[in-house]
């Protein structure tokens, strides 16, 4: 894990990989990192939320180190580092918060002091210039670490103002768990990379990450096939909620549904 307190980074050229929250899914994270390297990625970035949802959160850190993945802090990471009582996910519905709390309590109990110290060093964002475009990597949005940028809820005008206020041409975010991107009328680009640790509520067991390839300013979303059944069994061994395990095995969300806007929820099973 590369800790850059300033959030500055050298300007990476060539193909780079952008990964959303691992959510303790160490099997998918490793599969995505290996796939990105095979595809020629010269730099890998993770947009935070290392823990939550999956089992044995400590298995994430060696993978970040092994592949040299530069990482920023998500709301989960900030909460764990500061020993807050909850994940600060930004949910408002009691059912969403109930499952979020069960996930957070499990992760909190299994996070060591050494790991908390690592999380405390993660920068909130990373900025760099690539092919004359100013790029910002953040977790939720430039305004709030837990702001949800849903495709159906974000107008062009809102996104253009968001990028303009952040002084960037390309904004890369995560937090929602569902990947999407949009080129704006003024040339700005919003890329939400979703999450590498959980399916995108699309009925597929694969998870997703994004590639920014040399010569392109738009992302290509890459599905990650991994041994989801081994992860599901590990989750069961750790007595994680059956609803979480079902999502891994089916690709459909069973929790954190109430936060979804109507259009995003209509694409799912529940």
Predicted regions and their residues:
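Core catalytic region of metal-dependent phosphoesterases/phosphodiesterases
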Residues: 3, 7-9, 14-19, 24-109, ...
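Conserved beta-strand scaffold positions in the cores of enzyme catalytic domains, especially
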Residues: 18, 71, 171, 190-192, ...
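Glycine-rich phosphate-binding loop signature in dinucleotide/nucleotide-binding domains
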Residues: 11, 36-41, 129-131, 164-167, ...
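Acidic, His/Gly-rich catalytic cores of divalent-metal-dependent hydrolytic chemistry
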Residues: 11, 183-270
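Active-site environment of divalent metal-dependent phosphoester hydrolases
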Residues: 23-28, 52-55, 76-82, 143, ...
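Active-site-proximal segments of metal-dependent phosphoesterases and phosphodiesterases across multiple
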Residues: 91-98, 131-166
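Anionic-ligand binding region
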Residues: 156-196
């Amino acid at each position: 894990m590369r800790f850059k307190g300033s959030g500055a980074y050298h300007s990476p050229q060539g193909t780079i990989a952008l990964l959303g929250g691992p959510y303790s899914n160490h099997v998918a994270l490793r599969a995505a990192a290996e796939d990105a390297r095979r595809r020629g990625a010269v730099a890998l970035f993770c947009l935070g939320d290392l823990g939550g949802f999956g089992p044995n959160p400590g298995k994430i850190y060696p993978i970040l180190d092994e592949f040299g993945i530069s990482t920023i802090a998500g709301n989960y990471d900030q909460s764990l580092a500061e020993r807050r009582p909850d994940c600060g996910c930004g949910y408002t519905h009691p059912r969403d918060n109930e499952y979020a709390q069960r996930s957070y309590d499990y992760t909190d109990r299994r996070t060591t002091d050494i790991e908390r110290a690592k999380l405390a060093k993660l920068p909130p964002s990373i900025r760099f210039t690539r092919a004359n475009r100013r790029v910002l990597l953040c977790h939720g949005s430039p305004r709030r670490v837990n702001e949800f940028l849903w495709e159906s809820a974000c107008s062009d005008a809102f996104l253009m103002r968001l990028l303009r206020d952040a002084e960037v041409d390309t904004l890369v975010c995560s937090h929602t768990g569902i990947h999407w991107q949009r080129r704006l009328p003024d040339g700005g680009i919003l890329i939400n990379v979703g999450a590498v640790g959980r399916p995108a509520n699309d009925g597929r067991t694969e998870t997703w990450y994004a590639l920014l390839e040399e010569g392109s300013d738009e992302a290509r979303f890459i599905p990650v096939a991994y041994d989801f059944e081994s992860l599901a069994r590990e989750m069961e061994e750790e007595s994680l909620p059956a609803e979480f395990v079902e999502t891994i095995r089916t690709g459909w969300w069973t929790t954190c549904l109430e936060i979804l806007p109507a259009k995003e929820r209509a694409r799912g099973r529940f």
